[in-house]
Each structure stands twice: as C-alpha cells, then as structure tokens.
Amino acid sequence: MPKMKTKSSAKKRFKITATGKIKVAAAGKRHGMIKRSNKFIRDARGTMILAEPDAKKVIHCYLPNGL
C-alpha cells in the first residue's frame, strides 16, 4: 500500500514546531476590519498554536508524513 500524500494546502497553512505543536495564522483578517475592535485586530496579528484535539485531526488527516 502506498504512503499517504501530504495535502498541499496544509503545507502552506501549518507549521510544526520542534515540540510537535502546530502553528497557524489567526483567522478572520481577510476583510471587514472596520467593524472589528482594536483588541481583535491586535490579537489576530501574529500566529497561534492549535488546540490539542484540532492538532491531532490536522496531523492525522492532512499531514501524515509531517511537512
């Protein structure tokens, strides 16, 4: 049976840290910033670490062989 391929879209969206956690960009910043609070814009500026249940799903479904 052949190896599962890593999804190309996942390669572009996720980074795996040295400890095995998954780093992603914060969601909700594509458009509509006028109606967002300044706190939301500040908090969504950088990257965030996915929660453990979500990270397991991402690794199992989209990144079977890592990046």
UniProtKB/Swiss-Prot annotation:
Pfam families recorded: Ribosomal_L35p (PF01632)
Family: Belongs to the bacterial ribosomal protein bL35 family.
Gene3D superfamilies the UniProt entry points to: 4.10.410.60
UniProt keyword list: Ribonucleoprotein, Ribosomal protein
Family annotation (InterPro entries): Ribosomal_bL35 (IPR001706), Ribosomal_bL35-like (IPR021137), Ribosomal_bL35_CS (IPR018265), Ribosomal_bL35_sf (IPR037229)
Name listed for the protein in its UniProt record: Large ribosomal subunit protein bL35
Species of provenance: Bartonella bacilliformis (strain ATCC 35685 / KC583 / Herrer 020/F12,63)
Lineage: Bacteria, Pseudomonadati, Pseudomonadota, Alphaproteobacteria, Hyphomicrobiales
One term of GO molecular function: structural constituent of ribosome
Keyword DNA-binding in annotation: no
HAMAP family noted in UniProt: Ribosomal_bL35
CC terms in the record's Gene Ontology section: cytosolic large ribosomal subunit
GO biological process, any: translation
